[in-house]
Amino acid sequence: MGAGQSTNTSGHGASPEEMSRILAHRFASKCFTPLELTHLKDNFYSLALKQGDIHYWNEEVLSRFLGIPDGDEKFGLGTLDAGPVIFRMVSYLGAFPFQNTLAPSVLTFDAMVKVIVLLTDRYGKVLRRGKKDRIKLLFGSLADIGRKEASPITSGDKSDNDQGRPKTRSDEAGFSVDKPSNDADDYNDDDDLVLAALESLDAIEVFKHDQRIDRTAYEAHISFDTFQRLLMLFVVIAPLQSCEKTSEYFSQLNEESLKSARYCVENILTSFDIGDRTKGIDYETFYWVISTSLPYMFDPLTPLFEHLLFSKNLDLSRRKDSGTCSVSEEKQKKTEFCISPSHPPIILPGSFKPCILDSAVISHLSFFLSTSFPTPNLLQNGTRLHGVFSSDTHGESLTSFSHNVLTWDAPSILLVTGSINHSSGDEADIITVGAYIPQPWKLPASTSTSHYDTSHQSQLPYLFQLSPRYAVMQGSPSINSLKPNLPVVSFSTKSGIAIGCKIPPPTRTSMDSSRPTPAGSGSLWIDPALENAEFVMSNGLSHEEGVFLPPGIARWSPSRPPSKAESETIKISIYNIEVWGVVQTAPTPAQSPYHSRTSTANGDIPDAVARQQANWNFEAREAERRREIHLNVGGGDSEEQTGRALLEMAGIIGDSARRR
């Protein structure tokens, strides 16, 4: 793939096109297996248009292959017309690392190689700075201001083998978003830097060649319309796997699911909205929100573009048998998965019918919630959700909540929906808040303290608001050093459910009726009747240290630090409460402590669902045993008291039994 070109090639006379081509060859040899390259070539050249010696893809071919809507009004108002957005992104990324000179690029095979590397998270071997550089590239690919138009392909020029294509020359002005704003700082050793970068595969240095002092990038904006269409695509295809047909996700859409997806997208857009939407989204806001509140939002691009690495025209089984290609066990698993009809749904069978958790909410959760390591995205790491509690199904009772939730010994997601109680008497808005609890809920009488592995985000709690606006508060890295009266979650039949709250000491008159108070940057309190809740969010200056960090929203970015304490308390009239248990079906490198929990009651049971059922069976047997003992004691009052005293001393009933 041109590996011999770099070491001895003089970079001083090489054009950007030549350097870009050499880099594409290095990307191909470094980031793909021979089998993947074979599939990619077959997919590309079997559909490529041709002009002279140039093979390329246009927007229509790209959208048709990926299975995404392109100018389809079926879904209404163009909200799912993602084809033009994806095409503009790849035409920008295909010019990497010379966007200033070559963008928008023609989608040749070399350009497509670079696009796939950048969009499928394979850039880690060449992009030293990783995520930050990728976010900047993604921003540039979506920014509107200063974008030049590619030469259109007229219908009269189209044919099966010959179509007009956008002309790109190195002396043309590219995207002004990428144009260096201070040419006086140019250096004479730029070609040396590029040559050294190609020799060492240090792509970030190549990137700097075209982005030396890119101050104008911070002045460009992404239009909300463009970003809305991209978000709609992500919400719909978030569960997509590499070998699934993308079109099936769109064919299954109905009016209800479309409405839910639009509502989800609008809520997410609020986190980018810091003023006038007509101005669009600037780079600082984009970078800050993506990195702090939506770190996995672009993950659907990985399986979407990995479609290019699987060709239906090639006989994979014959290739493996003949030994013509070296295929690792991981690649064999991908091949086996490719022929399966579909992946299992994330909600396990036997769960209750959800009132809050729909496909759009699941997609939204996957954009920020880390449930395992090293693959955090819950739709890509084998996570399954089991219905643990629903106020609609199990009733609005803390007794029922305790029976279902406190016997669940794995992570869980709490979701609460209701109406906002406005003091002004305005029409109530529907709000959805929730929390991710990475460890089992504890019994009220439990005295043990929880320890959280702060090295993995999946082991830290989250507190979040999903609608009508979006905000997320991550668990504090210093969570293990907090005082005992600042637990992540507290449960009491008298004071209710508290998450991230400060628990007051019990009084003599009432052991636990004192109401928990907000602490830190976020908290959620639900009253004992499960009828009302209070959701508190602050910038960290209005309350003492607590479980959660301030919300990672744009107006509190590092360059715009809060000058004074800001806090918001939202009073909620609860409609529904749901608790979903998190079950890992894929093996993780380091099994969490709660997976190894065993006892005489449940033994060595492989998953949390079976362990919970075993706990319930054990409790039922114990209740039956107590009833039989009680009946054998006698019916008189004095005899009953004597019998109860004997049972308490034996540890069968009372506080001693609860602590066993």
UniProtKB/Swiss-Prot annotation:
InterPro entries recorded: TLDc_dom (IPR006571)
Transmembrane segments: none
Pfam assignment, any one: TLD
Main location (coarse class): cytoplasm
Keywords assigned: Cytoplasm
Places the protein is found: Cytoplasm
Record's compositionally biased regions (Basic and acidic residues): 157-172
Chain spans, region Disordered: 150-187
Residue ranges of coiled coil: none
Domain TLDc residue range list: 355-583
PROSITE patterns according to UniProt: TLDC
SMART domains, A to Z: TLDc
A cellular-component GO term for this protein: cytoplasm
Role summary: May be involved in a process influencing telomere capping.
Family per record: Belongs to the RTC5 family.
Name of this chain's protein: Restriction of telomere capping protein 5
Species in which this protein is naturally found: Arthroderma benhamiae (strain ATCC MYA-4681 / CBS 112371) (Trichophyton mentagrophytes)
